[in-house]
Amino acid sequence: MRILPVALLAGMCVLPANLSAQHVTADGAAQTFSFLTGQYFDDYFKMNPTAGTAAGLHQYDTQLEDYSAAGVGRQIATLHDWEKKLSAIDPKALDAEPAADYQILLNSIRAQLLQLEVVRGWEKNPDGYSSGVTGSIFSIMERPYAPVNVRLRAVVEREKLIPQVLQDARKNLKNPPRIYTEIALEQIDDLVDFFTTDVPSAFADADDAQAKADFAQTNPAVIAALKSYGAWMKSDLLPRSNGDFRYGADTFSKALVYDEMVDTPLDRLLAIGLADLHKNQAEFARVAKAIDPAKTPQQELAELATIHPAPDKLLQAFHDKFNSEIAFIKSHHIITLPSDVEPVLEETPPFMRATTQASMDAPGPFETHSTKAYFNVTLPEKGWSPERVAEHMAAFNVGTLVSTSVHEAYPGHYVQFLFEPQFPSTIRKLIGANTNVEGWAHYCEQMMLDEGYGQPGAGADNAREANLIRLGQLQDALLRDARFIAGIRMHTGVGGAMTQDEAVQFFVTEGYQSKAIGEMETKRGTSDALYLYYTLGKLEILKLREDVKKKRGAAFSLQQFHDDFMKQGTAPIKVIRKAMLHDDSPVL
């Protein structure tokens, strides 16, 4: 279960003695749970200050996570202590909504313990350290929530602590999987470039003499520490990186329960994923035949990749899509838009361009100063060859342009952000299930086209373009289906063990992706084991919609369904099912 960006917790919580060990009676359950929730998040952000920054709690900006082995030990002890405190509450004594929040919070704690005690990424993933500390600085840079001098001073304080983190990494890392060390080595030069170029550029306007003088000391020290870390990984860690990245079936199943509240047996889950893959492949073949019966799917995709706006028209193309999607959402009563304020559409800032093509940057739930959301689009760089420009722009083809704008903005992530003030609790604002967040955005890609968007006069210029838009949506769906299947098979062996090479080939032959995408997705899947959550969430939402439709009958309204879903926050779909259907029926 996702809590705003998480690193490593450290420190101990302190609660009144009468709440720490005694079983809480029914009469005091609601009050006690409310109190404990506040205490938990106070401690959580003290131990995860980067997450505090992302949430908009800037009292944590000058602090950094404790990555030491002792810090990990304190985190584990803290989480067990919190698990014990929460277990003293009888959830049956709580009303329906707080009872659901109780389970969300308890599962989140257990998910963190599973990662620390069983998966043990802190002993296995060297990139968690180098990218983790980089993320701590990026979280201060990415939004102008405070004057540049204030944010530079925060960067200096965090940078002072980074070299020690990279020393802690050397002590903690035992026997990483070779692929993890290879990924960390692939990343390290970009991280060095980030501190060499992007961080100074972001604070070029600072005029606090002392902060600038301090930064002139801390930033080179971080660069040197990262270079040293990279050299150590290459000469020392890589030759002894012989570990296993696989979760195993038991850990994978537990992670699904704790993160997503899904307890479907893995063999059935795999069958569901394969069925969706085959359904989308059949639909892809049907649409491709309608475009040109003489071409193979691969030939159709090669043509699709060439149909995109000119680079200097890309931002305007997204602006036009937003307007078109907003008009369609309103005229077809897809969902209530809580605000007419649109995200700020802009070119991706330089320090983000290496890692994203298009992204939605929304403020944290407690941000009070920089409250705008930014939709960032990465344009080709000056000096690129025509071939590289063409490769980059293929990601913004006529199909992907629609899928991306729907997924990231209307009615995907941005609209969910607009509903955030209506989320029923702090827990729903801070802890989210990926099957909800990414499942909703992926569901929207299909739902909008099913409802008629992307047809001539509604997002497409003609019937051929409408088919190309659907083809792009289906290719994106097949990518998510391939993740679903590869994740299960690589990590559990259910359905037959899958090697990394076999996973790459699966993405190419069954997911209709390029080899480069297949390699990238396979690498991601070695550490993001549960990246099935896109398709899993979409399928859960589709089933929920059908079940609500059956229950409401003639009174069913798609807009009302979507509004009701959004107002529940980013909770696991199981929680939302119970709120909307008042039963414990299966999510799939």
Question: Model features per residue range: what roles?
Answer:
Residues 5-16:
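Bacterial N-terminal signal peptides
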Residues 22-588:
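N-terminal maturation segment of proteins
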Residues 16-22:
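Signal peptide processing junction and immediate N-terminal pro/mature segment
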